[in-house]
C-alpha cells in the first residue's frame, strides 16, 4: 500500500467544518487501520500494534453501527466510498 495514499471520501471543505462528524471519525479510523495493517505486514510480531489495531477496528465498528441506525443512506454511501465490507449481522 502506498504510504501517502489519501482517501477522498469527504471534500476538503467538509473536513474543515465537520471534524467531529461520524463520517469524519470513520474516515480517520479507516486511514489509521490501513496504515497499521501495512505496518503489521512488515513487523509480524509487533503485538502492541496488533492490539491497537483491534481496538481501532472495534471503535470503527461501533461508529458504523451507530451511523447505520441513524441514517442508512449515508452509511451505504460511506461504505461504498471507503471500500469497507458490510459487517455480518448476528
UniProtKB/Swiss-Prot annotation:
Annotated compartments: Plastid, Chloroplast
Keyword field: Chloroplast, Plastid, Ribonucleoprotein, Ribosomal protein
InterPro entries noted in UniProt: Ribosomal_uS15, Ribosomal_uS15_bac-type, uS15_NS1_RNA-bd_sf
One of the GO biological process terms: translation
Gene3D superfamilies: S15/NS1, RNA-binding
Record-level Gene Ontology MF annotations: structural constituent of ribosome
Main subcellular localisation: plastid
KW Ribonucleoprotein (keyword) present: yes
GO cellular component, one term: chloroplast
Keyword Ribosomal protein on entry: yes
Subunit structure: Part of the 30S ribosomal subunit.
Protein family: Belongs to the universal ribosomal protein uS15 family.
Name of the protein: Small ribosomal subunit protein uS15c
Organism for this UniProt entry: Piper cenocladum
Amino acid at each position: 500500500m502506498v504510504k501517502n495514499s489519501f482517501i477522498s471520501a469527504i471534500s476538503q471543505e467538509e473536513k474543515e467544518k465537520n471534524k467531529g462528524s461520524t463520517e469524519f471519525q470513520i474516515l480517520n479510523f479507516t486511514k489509521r487501520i490501513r496504515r497499521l495493517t501495512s505496518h503489521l505486514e512488515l513487523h509480524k510480531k509487533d503485538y502492541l500494534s496488533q492490539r491497537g489495531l483491534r481496538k481501532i477496528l472495534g471503535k470503527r465498528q461501533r461508529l458504523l453501527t451507530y451511523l447505520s441506525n441513524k441514517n442508512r443512506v449515508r452509511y451505504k454511501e460511506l461504505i461504498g466510498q471507503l471500500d469497507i465490507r458490510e459487517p455480518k449481522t448476528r
